[in-house]
């Protein structure tokens, strides 16, 4: 019984990896059908549906992986790092680095791969980015409590500016067919961003 569950889990992971790889390839710029995915995995469409009730559930699983990966690591950054600008820099670098290592998933993060899918998938991605923006805002607010001085501009505006930078870099990555890496020249860009905060 345990072996059967392990095989099923491995097949599920294989299907999700194939979907992520297809999103990374030229197929990712078009709608991915279950027929194409099944052919890529080397199984029938019926076999896909034994592991996932729908393509939406496959995307749900990939979004869950994105959410878990980012939120877990952001929480570790917040736990381990206390200096405001280092926290912000590490969170942005985390998002950009994750996207760079997972180009197919970046198409999901930007919503590009979800254009032809159910609206609730895009809603999940929107909620993820809203949570990240909220965490950035909280880091900025804690700076005022910790150091006794705030920023010249409202924390909400600053948090949205930082997140907009990330989203812009992810969009550029997709638009360039993954030529322009999101972390490219980050060490030069970060001081410019940090200067805007003061």
From Swiss-Prot:
Residue ranges flagged as DNA-binding region: 33-52
InterPro entries: DNA-bd_HTH_TetR-type_CS, Homeodomain-like_sf, HTH-type_TetR-like_transc_reg, HTH_TetR, NO_SlmA, SlmA-like_C, Tet_transcr_reg_TetR-rel_C_sf
Keywords: Cell cycle, Cell division, Coiled coil, Cytoplasm, DNA-binding
Domain of life: Bacteria
Subcellular location: Cytoplasm, Nucleoid
A GO biological process held by the record: cell division
Keyword check for NAD: no
Self-association state and partner proteins as the record states: Homodimer. Interacts with FtsZ.
Protein name per its UniProtKB record: Nucleoid occlusion factor SlmA
Originating organism: Pectobacterium carotovorum subsp. carotovorum (strain PC1)
